[in-house]
Amino acid sequence: MAPRKPSKKVGPQKRPSAEKRVITSKKKQLRNQSFKSRVKTTLKKFELAVQSGDVASISAGLSSVYSIADKAVKRGIFKKGKADRVKARASGRACPTA
């Protein structure tokens, strides 16, 4: 990255685009990490519901897994195939005999 040249203008200076990209990519990375953490937490809660065997909590957990996987695709955090895989595995865990 080239050093900044002193400008003669008074007022806010423009930020070099490479520096701006670093800042925005870090913001995006933090946002994506927090959402992935929410996905993992939802999957863990669903797994606990499956282990408890309560039908109502399994149904609610499966619904929340589907919802959060679809939101991840919509936000561009997961690809569609990964979301489909997560949902298929959760569905298989919900009713293993079917």
From Swiss-Prot:
Family: Belongs to the bacterial ribosomal protein bS20 family.
Its job: Binds directly to 16S ribosomal RNA.
PANTHER family: 30S RIBOSOMAL PROTEIN S20, SMALL RIBOSOMAL SUBUNIT PROTEIN BS20C
Keyword terms: Ribonucleoprotein, Ribosomal protein, RNA-binding, rRNA-binding
Biased composition (Basic residues): 1-12
Entry-linked Gene3D superfamilies: Ribosomal protein S20
Membrane-traversing stretches: none
Ranges where the record places region Disordered: 1-34
This protein's GO CC annotations: cytosol; small ribosomal subunit
Protein name: Small ribosomal subunit protein bS20
InterPro entries reported in the protein's UniProt record: Ribosomal_bS20, Ribosomal_bS20_sf
Molecular functions per Gene Ontology: small ribosomal subunit rRNA binding; structural constituent of ribosome
GO biological process terms held by the UniProt record: translation
